[in-house]
């Protein structure tokens, strides 16, 4: 199936970049076998939730101390530590370097990898290992991938790559939004909104 510009406009009514997104998706979706109404609906729904309607292409870590304690208590076990990070002038960088240190292929907190490889793209690609794998698939460097992820094409292609790499079409074919969400999010955060996007997308795509 072909996702038309009018359909995308209905799916993302507040997005001013429909032409850009449509140009990217019309090429990429068929390339990654996201080519049936259920697959396209599931893909667009998940991306719309993850990116605030295809508007946010970089992870926002602008958290207050209370949120750091609530969301990342493992890394901020005390109020004092959370406050220390929340009040830093470069707090998003500092927070990323702490919460993503020594995992997903990243170095320790001092390496700066956490922020360098923080979430980017429509389905936020996170961690040095994922950046390297995505870059390798395109035969570019992780640094080039980081820049590419800031473009419409790169943000969309990284999401398609993640979708294919994690075999998400099998869950899209079943309409299993719960499992899809767990594969993307690690949990079920925002499930209600994702389902709402999905049902709307199915309607728009005439399925």
Language-model-derived ranges and their functions:
Residues 26, 44, 159-160, 181, ...:
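Non-transmembrane alpha-helical segments in soluble domains
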Residues 170, 183-207:
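Low-complexity, Gly/Ser/Thr/Pro-rich intrinsically disordered linker/tail segments
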Residues 1-43:
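Flexible propeptides and autoinhibitory/regulatory segments associated with cysteine proteases
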Residues 2-20, 48-161:
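Peptidoglycan-targeting cell-wall enzymes and recognition modules
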Residues 160-169:
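Extended serine/threonine-enriched, polar tracts that run as long, contiguous segments within proteins
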Residues 33-43, 56-60, 169-181:
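Surface-exposed patches in mature extracellular/periplasmic domains of secreted proteins
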Residues 27-35, 144-150, 172:
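Short, mixed-charge amphipathic alpha-helical segments
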Residues 47-50, 173-190:
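Acidic helix/loop microenvironments that form the catalytic cleft of cell-wall polysaccharide enzymes
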């Amino acid at each position: 199936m072909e996702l038309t510009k009018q359909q995308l406009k209905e799916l993302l009514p507040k997005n001013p970049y429909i032409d850009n997104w449509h140009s990217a998706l019309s090429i990429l979706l068929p390339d990654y076998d996201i080519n049936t109404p259920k697959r396209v609906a599931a893909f667009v729904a998940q991306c719309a939730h993850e990116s605030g309607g295809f508007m946010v292409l970089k992870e926002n870590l602008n958290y207050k101390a209370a949120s750091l304690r609530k969301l990342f208590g493992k890394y901020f076990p005390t109020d004092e530590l959370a406050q220390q990070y929340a009040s830093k002038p470069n707090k998003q960088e500092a927070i990323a370097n702490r919460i993503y240190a020594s995992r997903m292929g990243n170095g320790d907190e001092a390496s700066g990898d956490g922020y360098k490889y923080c979430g980017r793209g429509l389905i936020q690609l996170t961690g040095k290992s994922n950046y390297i794998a995505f870059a390798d698939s395109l035969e570019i460097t992780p640094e080039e991938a980081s820049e590419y992820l800031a473009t419409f094409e790169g943000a969309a292609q990284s999401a398609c790559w993640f979708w294919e790499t994690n075999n998400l079409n099998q869950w899209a074919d079943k309409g299993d939004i719960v499992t899809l969400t767990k594969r993307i999010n690690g949990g079920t955060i925002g499930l209600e909104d994702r389902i709402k996007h999905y049902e709307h997308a199915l309607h728009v795509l005439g399925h």
